[in-house]
Amino acid sequence: MPKLEMMLLVLLILPLCYIDAVGPPPPWNMEDEIIEHWQKLHCHEISDLTPWILCSPEPLCGGKGCCAQEVCDCSGTACTCPPCL
């Protein structure tokens, strides 16, 4: 077998071995990425101690604990939002 053909064969087989050793890539969840991007644009995180509570300058409902700033009750490091109607 000529050297060029041998080199091409090795270059074709080598990536297959690497992919098998590493395993398949994790599934991509577009919904979580969209929610995270939306929260970065519209929400303000109050405290590192309560990352699940977010206050927004707009009256928003749902979306992982996001509520309007005027109804978001914050004292110290804790914040609470009223339930959405």
From Swiss-Prot:
Coiled coil: none annotated. Expressed by the venom duct. Contains 5 disulfide bonds. One of its GO terms (molecular function) is toxin activity. It is found in: Secreted. The keyword Cell wall biogenesis/degradation does not apply. It comes from the Eukaryota. The cysteine framework is XXVIII (C-C-C-CC-C-C-C-C-C). This is Conotoxin Lt28.4. It comes from Conus litteratus (Lettered cone).
